[in-house]
Amino acid sequence: MNLIAKLEQEEIARALGEKTIPEFAPGDTVIVSVNVVEGTRKRVQAYEGVVIAKRNRGLNSSFIVRKISSGEGVERTFQTYSPLLASIVVKRRGDVRRAKLYYLRDRSGKSARIKEKLVSKGRAASQA
């Protein structure tokens, strides 16, 4: 492992602390809890939506979450190892055949639905 990769791994470990980031993929519905600072007040804001893209670049990894808010599509990019992220919870797994789901931007209603990934019996037993 070269020096830069080693430093990056140490930085990721330091950024995570005791937090754990669950495995998630494009198509999954996630709830991202974000620490928001407004003046002197700190609060946690939940952002729920579908992961439409994931960018794995070590410390610079990020993912885009899309949701429909008041009939308008809203996308937000999150840095995976940001200290502003309180937690990530996977609500449901989506079954998609693409790595980037940008085509969902052009769709609305039923055509924007994503099938749920069914977990096989063998895999469900190993996860429990």
Curated annotation (Swiss-Prot):
| Protein origin, superkingdom | Bacteria
GO biological process: what's one of them? translation
* GO CC term (a single one): cytosolic large ribosomal subunit
> What is the organism of origin for this protein?
Paraburkholderia xenovorans (strain LB400)
Gene3D superfamilies xref list: 2.30.30.790
Q: Which PANTHER family match?
A: LARGE RIBOSOMAL SUBUNIT PROTEIN BL19M, RIBOSOMAL PROTEIN L19
Question: What's the stated role of this polypeptide?
Answer: This protein is located at the 30S-50S ribosomal subunit interface and may play a role in the structure and function of the aminoacyl-tRNA binding site.
Q: Which InterPro entries match?
A: Ribosomal_bL19, Ribosomal_bL19_CS, Ribosomal_bL19_sf, Translation_prot_SH3-like_sf
Q: What is the name of this protein?
A: Large ribosomal subunit protein bL19
Family in the record: Belongs to the bacterial ribosomal protein bL19 family.
Q: Which Pfam families match?
A: Ribosomal_L19
A GO term for molecular function: structural constituent of ribosome
- What are the UniProt keywords, alphabetically? Ribonucleoprotein, Ribosomal protein
Q: Which gene encodes it?
A: rplS
